Amino acid sequence: MKFNKEKLVIHACVLLFIIISIGLVFHRLQTKTNSIEPIHKETKLSDNAKYLVDRNKGKGEPSKLKEVYNSKDPKYKKIDRYLQNSLFNGSVAVYENGKLKMSKGYGYQDFEKGIKNTPNTMFLIGSAQKFSTGLLLKQLEEEHKININDPVSKYIPWFKTSKPIPLKDLMLHQSGLYKYKSSKDYKNLDQAVRAIQKRGIDPKKYKKHMYNDGNYLVLAKVIEEVTGKSYAENYYTKIGDPLKLQHSAFYDEKSFRKYFAKGYSYNSTGLSFLKPNVLEQYYGAGNIYMTPTDMGKLITQIQQYKLFSPKITNPLLHEFGTKQYPDEYRYGFYVKPTLNRLNGGLFGQVFTVYYNDKYVVVLALNVKGNNEVRIKHIYNDILKQNKPYNTKGVIVQ
């Protein structure tokens, strides 16, 4: 009898040990799983996508834009002849003294279907979208919701890096973050920014200028965190809707898709379509389509103080080499001696803008090529605008 009792006690102890061991192993696995924030976590629909779906419910196509061109004006006739003779494939818009003077398409929006470029054609603006992100950032500064000198981690607590990164360094492309590498695995902006944080800082590039899409993706995420709204909602409520940019849209807005240009490049077999495949992660740095007229409209309204006061606008658009704006680059665009410039290129499309107080020239092409050569010729040689415009070191009121 005594033997049986001892046997039962031993069996009970063994069973208890096994149960405790299994529990500990399960607890450790659970803790490990919870401590890792997955970069590639699947989501049904991002906040940006949800907002755009709701916004576009029942929405019809945008209004049609008419061609604007005066063949009796010698300078616009020269621009037209030059673009035709250079076999330009895209669209142009020129504003003079705040008024649209030329808006015309050349070549094809879709070669396979034979659809021609028109003033209604919308082009993927690529890095020119950083200008809009910069404007949103500037608005938050003026609303005292952010301080440009604060570290990113103040606004995105999990964005921890080996060295502090002020928002200003992201804006100026001197954060030192490793160059962003897009991946089909990243399904939204949040996953892209987590990947950027995980790669961290290149010590050799810290505090040195290195152009990097990743900087503006992180800024887009900061904008979302500070406002509690998606990047897309911020864009529309603070820029797109107030300034009536009705011919601009994010890549996944279905009601606009028939006007989206397809991007191409030439290879050994001829013209090849370049299908955009990572735009869901490019909020803030390259997933908006615009007509050249809408971009010109945006810039002219900024010049007319419809977004910021003169006190903010004039230094923003004219100063460089000053304490406030030591570099030519700021908020997604360049301030240079003879002009202001923004540019973007992605998936065979190039979108370039040159402007001063008199002219805004927007040139968009959808067959990969050198857009800079054409817009320089138009701005410098035809419109004769290669004169001093901004002066280094001069403070502008």
Curated annotation (Swiss-Prot):
EC class of the enzyme, as a word: hydrolase
Subcellular location: Cell membrane
Major subcellular site: membrane
Record keywords: Antibiotic resistance, Cell membrane, Cell wall biogenesis/degradation, Hydrolase, Membrane, Signal
EC number annotated for this UniProt entry: 3.1.1.103
Membrane topology classification: Peripheral membrane protein
One MF annotation (Gene Ontology) recorded for this entry: hydrolase activity
GO cellular component assignments: plasma membrane
Signal peptide: 1-27
Biological process, per Gene Ontology: cell wall organization; response to antibiotic
SUPFAM superfamilies referenced in this protein's UniProt entry, alphabetically: beta-lactamase/transpeptidase-like (SSF56601)
UniProt xrefs under InterPro entries: Bact_CellWall_Synth/Modif (IPR050491), Beta-lactam-related (IPR001466), Beta-lactam/transpept-like (IPR012338)
Reaction equations catalysed: [(4-D-Ala)-(2-GlcNAc)-Rib-ol-P]n-[Gro-P]m-beta-D-ManNAc-(1->4)-alpha-D-GlcNAc-P-peptidoglycan + n H2O = [(2-GlcNAc)-Rib-ol-P]n-[Gro-P]m-beta-D-ManNAc-(1->4)-alpha-D-GlcNAc-P-peptidoglycan + n D-alanine
Pfam families reported for this sequence: Beta-lactamase
Domain of life, source organism: Bacteria
Functional description taken from the UniProt entry: Catalyzes the liberation of D-alanyl moieties present on wall teichoic acid (WTA) and lipoteichoic acid (LTA). Affects the methicillin resistance level and autolysis in the presence of Triton X-100 as well as the cell wall structure.
The protein's name: Teichoic acid D-alanine hydrolase
